[in-house]
Amino acid sequence: MYHAPETDGGRRDGPPHRPEPRGDHTTTTMHVDPYIVLGSAVVGFLVGMTGAGGGALMTPMLILLFGVKPSAAISSDLVAAVLMRPVGAGVHLKKGTVNRRLVGWMVLGSVPAAFLGAYLLHVLGHAKSAQTNIERVLGAALLLGAAAMVLRYILDRRGGNGRTGAIHEILPKPIPTIAIGVVGGVIVGMTSVGSGSLMIILLLFLYPTIGAKQLVGTDLTQAVPLTMAAALGALAFGHIAFGVTLSLILGSVPAVLVGSMLSSSAPDRYIRPVITFVIAASGLKYVGVGTTALGWILVAVLLAAFITWLAVKRPWARAETDLEGIDVTPHPEVE
């Protein structure tokens, strides 16, 4: 029964912890939160466009903005991802932008490794400390990877490469590709994050000529069984908030469909900057950057990226204009 004096007094005297939840985010209710639906739609669109950022953006959003308990936020995000990622993967499979052989080799390593990671987390004496340290290392790796992607973009533009969205034939390297799956699976099993962003960085380093559309499609597809394996652990041992999960599904599934349709048909030159931006944001969150600071940093990154784009584009455009004035028509030899 509701007693106004006791409730009001408790609310005044109790110390603030997280933001006051919007609605009932307990594990048993099915309340749909429209704000979570909207937020998950934004994240779902980014996941569909890039294949990355799901765990790094969705979970902090639930905890910091909506006051969901961390354990419930992680578990609910994983379960919702089981429906979200197959939608994006299906779009890319239909478009033919998935390297099925790469997916097979990666899954061969990632799914067993995900269970191994969950077991290691269970037996470690300082599990929370180990998880935090892993996330910090993962964040640093993602930031280095984002910087490498920017450098590669600059070099490609200077050299006149990477101006088409053609899908190149990628010959799988079985052992290194399985190793990528193992590394990603263990980290996902221990931290519940990194199934998309980490795999993208590792794939880029192993297969530097892979196209952006094929990169996103392959990453989304390999993440499906990996996310399912992690979600099984969440269902068995986690604390799922069913209302939060339903809200995430309602927002993210349609949005990831739209994002995947765009990423499977848009030119590479538009997709790669978005991938880099999302991976950089994920890396900053993993290393512990606060939400407000992250916002200002990302604004600065966008400004720097725009200035860099202007600096790189102008010489290339000028050279292209000069070439247009050159007569390349073959002439008969003069005897």
Where are these regions (language model features)?
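Juxtamembrane transmembrane-helix termini in multi-pass membrane transport proteins
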Residues: 50-103
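Generic transmembrane alpha-helix signature in multi-pass membrane proteins
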Residues: 58-60, 86-98, 185-189, 199-201, ...
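Transmembrane helix-bundle signature of multi-pass membrane transporters/permeases
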Residues: 74-82, 107-111, 216-224, 252-253, ...
